[in-house]
Amino acid sequence: MPTIMSAVVLLSGGLDSATVLRMAHATGQRIHALSFRYGQRHTMELEMARKQALSLPGVAHRIMDLQLSLFGGSALTADIPVPKGGVDENTIPVTYVPARNMVFLSLALAWAESLGAQHLYIGVNAVDYSGYPDCRPEFIQSFQQTANLATKAGVEGHPFTVHTPLINLTKAQIIQQGLALGVDYGLTRSCYDPDAQGAGCGLCDACRLRLQGFAEAGVPDPAPYQGP
């Protein structure tokens, strides 16, 4: 009987990571999904991550507590206003969480090595994104090289691969591929500054990119938004 490969998928509960979860699951690998409670103000996404994991058979899901809010430095984890009027494309926005993807991937790598898994999946995107440095292809390439230099598995000839299936897709293309795979986008949240019920503000950069993506895909966004 052939050995079933295993993979660790970073699952935030947002649109992109829910799509990546389905993509990874479709490969037939044994999927381990990892989410983080890191002090973010948009914690509703963790409930969405739980529901996304439960929607697929055989997915093991863990939520790890990691208080990046202790460091501050981001509008997502500190008392800093979330921009609502667009962002300057020439600067890194205040919604950037210092080294977040480096931290998340490092922990996913540690779990993968303990599981004997050689595949990591992350929903970074370099097309419709907000200018975060840890969403670029060069960062992913560098991390994969580091992963294989820094681990027992890597030096013993069992290298890791970091998969970024969304890296060159527009938000509309991501949505179209996700719908084809059966993603329920009503069970995802993207807003940086939602209300207490998890409804999106419709004005932050995450909401703007999401709404634009659904409009370009020609389908309505099923997530709730604040309004009169």
Swiss-Prot record:
Catalyzes the ATP-dependent conversion of 7-carboxy-7-deazaguanine (CDG) to 7-cyano-7-deazaguanine (preQ(0)). Pfam families: QueC (PF06508). Its EC number is 6.3.4.20. Pathway: Purine metabolism; 7-cyano-7-deazaguanine biosynthesis. Zn(2+) binds at residues 191, 201, 204, 207. The keyword Ligase applies. InterPro entries: QueC, Rossmann-like_a/b/a_fold. ATP binds at residues 11-21. GO terms for biological process: queuosine biosynthetic process. This is 7-cyano-7-deazaguanine synthase. It catalyses: 7-carboxy-7-deazaguanine + NH4(+) + ATP = 7-cyano-7-deazaguanine + ADP + phosphate + H2O + H(+).
